[in-house]
Design a protein with these regions (language model features):
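Conserved catalytic motifs of the protein kinase core domain
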Residues: 28, 119-121
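Cytochrome P450 core scaffold surrounding the K-helix E-X-X-R motif
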Residues: 131-140
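RNase H-like, Mg2+-dependent phosphodiesterase core
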Residues: 1, 139-142, 146
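Conserved, helical-rich catalytic subdomain that frames metal- and/or nucleotide-binding sites
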Residues: 146-153
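N-terminal lobe of the biotin/lipoate ligase/transferase fold
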Residues: 1-85, 89, 107
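Acidic (Asp/Glu) carboxylate-rich active-site/surface patches
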Residues: 82-117, 127
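Conserved beta-strand-loop-short alpha-helix elements that form
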Residues: 122-131
Length: 153
């Protein structure tokens, strides 16, 4: 599947833009942004965005009967395996949708669905702390570039 890319310097939320494209009839694509002003996390939480980190959403139609929970698991495995190529430290999944390194959160995945015209679509938002991480009281955070000598941008 070749996805069309949509790039923005600054937007509210990559997931919100992906949902807007779906509602306009664009059924697949990738949204990339340099900065989000209202990034979203699970259960209405805010994703704190810093310039230089990765903010993206992939959206597409789900054509088989796979459960949304399985899709969430698969997305976590894909992101974990991709990030593992950049460091020798073990990267782990903290269910349901967070990626940790050295017991610190570096990535969150937010999945949203849209049912439209008898079709099921999914939006997979990925927020990856590359160069800076927020200070959060409930859990420790960090950023990937701290743990790799490879250039990631």
């Amino acid at each position: 599947m070749k996805l069309k890319k949509f790039y923005y310097k600054k937007i509210k939320s990559t997931n919100d833009i992906a949902l807007k494209y779906l509602k306009k009839g664009i059924e697949e694509g990738v949204i990339l942004a340099d900065f989000q002003t209202k990034g979203k996390g699970q259960r209405g939480k805010k994703w704190i965005s810093f310039k230089g980190n990765l903010f993206m959403s992939v959206f597409f139609e789900v054509k088989n009967r796979i459960s949304l929970e399985k899709i969430t698991q698969l997305n976590c495995y894909i992101v974990r395996d991709c990030l593992q190529k950049f460091t020798s430290l073990k990267i782990v999944i903290k269910k349901p949708n967070d990626i940790y390194i050295n017991k610190q959160k570096i990535c969150g995945i937010l999945q949203e669905t849209l049912f439209q015209n008898k079709k099921k679509f999914i939006v997979v938002g990925i927020g990856l702390n590359l160069v800076k991480s927020p200070k959060i009281k409930k859990y420790p955070t960090n950023y990937l570039n701290k743990y790799t000598s490879k250039k990631i941008s």
